[in-house]
């Protein structure tokens, strides 16, 4: 199959299996959820009644005081007592095998093509690491919410994009399912397309 180049005459021949496959919504959902789960820190921690600071002594005798019976100042009912079902650090990551991950990326790329959200260019760069230059270039291309994918990370481009809201620059190794679906448009250089095909082959 062929994809039209935005900044050059002619078209780029690409793999049908990478850019022309059916959209597998269930697979994409599973991989995106797993990716987001893996990004969770999972470091929250609370103390149970066994872990909070305090004496093990019974605060007052069982009977005769008129007060409610109490066996420990560390009871969850008490102020500064332990938490009944205390949250503990945990690993939220989910296993996704390589075949599923690659399949999800292919599904997303194919859907981007179908929705005319994938823009192929011969090259994409700025002369200097200036936000103003990149902002003008994107304005000329009528792009606002965009992910720019290049074969190799262009430092000028990366620095120019840092201060632009809804603009991100990645190299091929840095793309993931979440970033590909998070932006309205994805601009990809011809070199990046070839690298993506090799990566997902």
UniProtKB/Swiss-Prot annotation:
Quaternary structure annotation from Swiss-Prot or TrEMBL: Part of the 50S ribosomal subunit.
InterPro entries: Ribosomal_uL4, Ribosomal_uL4-like, Ribosomal_uL4_dom_sf
Keyword terms: Repressor, Ribonucleoprotein, Ribosomal protein, RNA-binding, rRNA-binding, Transcription, Transcription regulation, Transcription termination, Translation regulation
UniProt region (Disordered), positions on chain: 45-73
Top-level taxon of origin: Bacteria
Family to which the UniProt record says this protein belongs: Belongs to the universal ribosomal protein uL4 family.
Gene Ontology cellular component annotations, sorted alphabetically: ribonucleoprotein complex; ribosome
A Gene Ontology biological process term: DNA-templated transcription termination
Molecular function (Gene Ontology), one example: structural constituent of ribosome
Purpose of the protein: One of the primary rRNA binding proteins, this protein initially binds near the 5'-end of the 23S rRNA. It is important during the early stages of 50S assembly. It makes multiple contacts with different domains of the 23S rRNA in the assembled 50S subunit and ribosome. Protein L4 is a both a transcriptional repressor and a translational repressor protein. It regulates transcription of the S10 operon (to which L4 belongs) by causing premature termination of transcription within the S10 leader. L4 controls the translation of the S10 operon by binding to its mRNA.
Name used for this protein in its record: Large ribosomal subunit protein uL4
